[in-house]
């Protein structure tokens, strides 16, 4: 008898440490320019996280602090040239404000790492997953990433894998302010690929909550 095709969901919390710091400050993690780094060290210190809006300027997720400072300077030189003024009228760490007002200087928040707080958030989010699936069907890959065997739950909830992923992630967003990307696949490898290579490149939906990509085994065959 042919074995039933299984469905796995991989969930990754976007720029997790940076998103937690934004959530703690009541800021939007998708539009706030923020890095998590210990500024008491040298400029060569590695940022533990970079917010999505700063990454959009070409700053990598594990940049050194001096790379962030250099890129911000470059961006501000370009902004000043466009307005043809020597001085900015103000500054902002929010991309929406910066887009609306070219005369504002780009700034960013440097948040000191708080590992105990990030672990606390991770535990809270894991408990949210437990509202939908049993612990034996959740594999914790890292502090910000899990794999879920959703096979048995799709019929129970009368949902597609995409709908179940959306429900869980929107719950996480509402309860914690943290956004995520999800990948769906017929095995762990495919859902990981769907999330890492495809879903993370898609802009969050209208709720700012989730992007999804679904890969099946036959779709990857030559």
Which role does the model predict for each range below?
Residues 1-216:
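Gly/Gly-Pro- and Ser/Thr-rich, intrinsically disordered tail segments characteristic of DNA damage-repair
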Residues 217-222:
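A short, hydrophobic C-terminal helix/tail in secreted or cell-surface proteins
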């Amino acid at each position: 008898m042919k074995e039933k095709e299984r469905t796995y969901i991989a969930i990754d919390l976007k720029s997790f440490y940076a998103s937690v710091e934004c959530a703690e400050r009541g800021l939007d993690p998708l539009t706030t320019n923020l890095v998590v780094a210990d500024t008491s060290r040298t400029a060569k210190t590695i940022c533990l996280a970079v917010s999505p809006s700063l990454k959009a300027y070409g700053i990598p997720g594990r940049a050194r602090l001096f790379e962030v400072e250099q890129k911000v300077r470059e961006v501000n030189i370009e902004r000043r040239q466009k307005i043809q003024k020597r001085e900015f009228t103000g500054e902002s760490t929010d991309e929406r404000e910066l887009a609306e007002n070219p005369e504002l200087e780009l700034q960013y928040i440097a948040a000191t790492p708080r590992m105990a707080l990030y672990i606390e958030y991770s535990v809270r989010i894991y408990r949210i997953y437990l509202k939908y699936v049993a612990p034996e069907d959740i594999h914790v890959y890292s502090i910000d990433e899990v794999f879920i065997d959703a096979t048995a739950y799709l019929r129970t909830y009368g949902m597609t894998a995409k709908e179940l992923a959306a429900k869980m992630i929107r719950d996480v967003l509402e309860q914690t302010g943290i956004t995520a990307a999800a990948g769906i696949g017929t095995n762990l490898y495919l859902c990981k690929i769907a999330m890492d290579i495809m879903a993370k490149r898609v802009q969050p939906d209208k709720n700012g909550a989730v992007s999804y990509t679904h890969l099946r085994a036959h779709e990857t065959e030559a």
